[in-house]
């Protein structure tokens, strides 16, 4: 038995669907080397946008300071965070829960607006805003998500139990695949 290690440098919410697709292709007779290249090519394009509705867990996990969490909660500030190639970045800050979903969809459209084979998935921590995100995405992208699923403990440990996520096909990054970027670090 040969074992192939694949590290997409992201949460399982992104690569789980594509691992299942790989398994289907292999079961139907595809060559492993072709399937791995296809997987890496797909992962080189995937991006995540997270929308936490509270700063409490982000403070606990050390992502933000206690002072920033208190002030942010008092002012109703909600960060819009991307996770790309294992790096998190606050892309925007919106004021009020009702602005989280529109900001996430807008950021996705900005980053992936002209991607030819655009696909997306929605993750959530079983909160009502998940339905709002799905509805907004269907309207903005003109098609349903590949999947809608509950976020796991790793995401929740970092962003909290009240988070929605949008993962989508963006543009290929840096002209290098995952392995080349990891080796360069």
For each feature predicted by the language model, list its residue ranges.
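Mixed-charge interfacial surface used for oligomerization/domain docking
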Residues: 1-4, 10-185
């Amino acid at each position: 038995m040969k074992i192939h290690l694949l590290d997409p440098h992201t949460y399982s919410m992104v690569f789980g669907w594509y691992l299942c697709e790989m398994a289907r292709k292999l079961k139907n007779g595809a060559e492993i080397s072709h399937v791995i290249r296809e997987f890496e090519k797909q992962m080189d394009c995937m991006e995540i946008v997270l929308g936490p509705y509270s700063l409490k867990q982000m403070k606990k996990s050390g992502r933000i300071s206690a002072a920033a969490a208190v002030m942010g909660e008092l002012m109703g500030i909600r960060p819009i965070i991307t996770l790309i190639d294992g790096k998190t970045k606050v892309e925007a800050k919106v004021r009020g829960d009702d602005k989280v979903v529109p900001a996430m969809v807008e950021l996705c459209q900005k980053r992936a607006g002209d991607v030819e084979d655009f696909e997306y998935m929605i993750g959530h921590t079983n909160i009502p805003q998940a339905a709002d995100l799905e509805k907004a995405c269907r309207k903005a992208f003109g098609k349903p998500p590949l999947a809608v699923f509950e976020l796991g403990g790793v995401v929740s440990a970092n962003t909290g139990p009240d988070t929605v996520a949008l993962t989508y096909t963006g543009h290929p990054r840096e002209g290098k695949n995952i392995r080349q970027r990891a080796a360069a670090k």
